From Swiss-Prot:
It comes from Chlamydia felis (strain Fe/C-56) (Chlamydophila felis). Keywords: Chaperone, Cytoplasm, Stress response. One of its GO terms (cellular component) is cytoplasm. The lineage of its organism: Bacteria, Pseudomonadati, Chlamydiota, Chlamydiia, Chlamydiales. Heptamer of 7 subunits arranged in a ring. Interacts with the chaperonin GroEL. NCBIfam families: PRK00364.2-2, PRK00364.2-4. This is Co-chaperonin GroES. The gene is groES.
Length: 102
């Protein structure tokens, strides 16, 4: 678990992963400041914490394919969004992670 996840006291359960989306662009390529309605959600996120793991049919815990600190690609509508102390986080299932980017 990352220091940030520990400080927040968030521990995902099962095959869930706590991620923080990368910061959104606040200006366009031409230098125009974008209003909140024009910003798009980033699909890149940093893995902050891993759950306990998914169990197979024999009850064995399967290892995660990602690790804390990885930059992953997730769908912009994936997971459950939550805001803690003004910061936005997303809890996704491992199956919602499409790729590891690092």
């Amino acid at each position: 678990m990352s220091d940030q996840a520990t400080a927040l006291k968030i521990k995902p359960l099962g095959d869930r992963i706590l991620v923080k989306r990368e910061e959104e662009d606040t200006t366009s390529h031409g230098g125009i400041i974008l209003p909140d309605t024009a910003k798009k959600k980033q699909d890149r996120a940093e893995v902050l914490a891993l759950g306990t793991g998914k169990r197979d049919k024999d009850g064995q815990i399967l290892p995660f394919e990602v690790k804390v600190g990885d930059i992953v690609l997730i769908d912009k509508y994936a997971g459950q969004e939550l805001t803690i102390e003004g910061e936005e986080y997303v809890i996704v299932q491992e199956s919602e992670v499409m790729a590891v980017l690092n």
